[in-house]
């Protein structure tokens, strides 16, 4: 039962982590583009 619970947590965290990295990279790109770098 604990394995299933941990598996569910991992499946829940992976999309959130990927989304966070994507948003961070996008904001860095927009910031650099705005500064003309």
Curated annotation (Swiss-Prot):
Membrane topology: Single-pass membrane protein
A single GO molecular function term of this UniProt record: electron transporter, transferring electrons within cytochrome b6/f complex of photosystem II activity
Keywords from the UniProt entry: Chloroplast, Electron transport, Membrane, Photosynthesis, Plastid, Thylakoid, Transmembrane, Transmembrane helix, Transport
InterPro entries reported for this sequence: Cyt_6/f_cplx_su5, Cyt_6/f_cplx_su5_sf
SUPFAM superfamilies to which the protein is assigned, alphabetical: PetG subunit of the cytochrome b6f complex
Stretches that traverse the bilayer: 5-25
BP GO annotations: cytochrome complex assembly; photosynthesis
Compartmental location: Plastid, Chloroplast thylakoid membrane
One cellular component (GO) term of this entry: cytochrome b6f complex
Family: Belongs to the PetG family.
Subunit and interaction comment: The 4 large subunits of the cytochrome b6-f complex are cytochrome b6, subunit IV (17 kDa polypeptide, PetD), cytochrome f and the Rieske protein, while the 4 small subunits are PetG, PetL, PetM and PetN. The complex functions as a dimer.
Record-linked NCBIfam families: PRK00665.1 (NF001907)
Protein role: Component of the cytochrome b6-f complex, which mediates electron transfer between photosystem II (PSII) and photosystem I (PSI), cyclic electron flow around PSI, and state transitions. PetG is required for either the stability or assembly of the cytochrome b6-f complex.
HAMAP family linked to this entry: Cytb6_f_PetG
Protein name, per record: Cytochrome b6-f complex subunit 5
Taxonomic lineage: Eukaryota, Viridiplantae, Streptophyta, Embryophyta, Tracheophyta
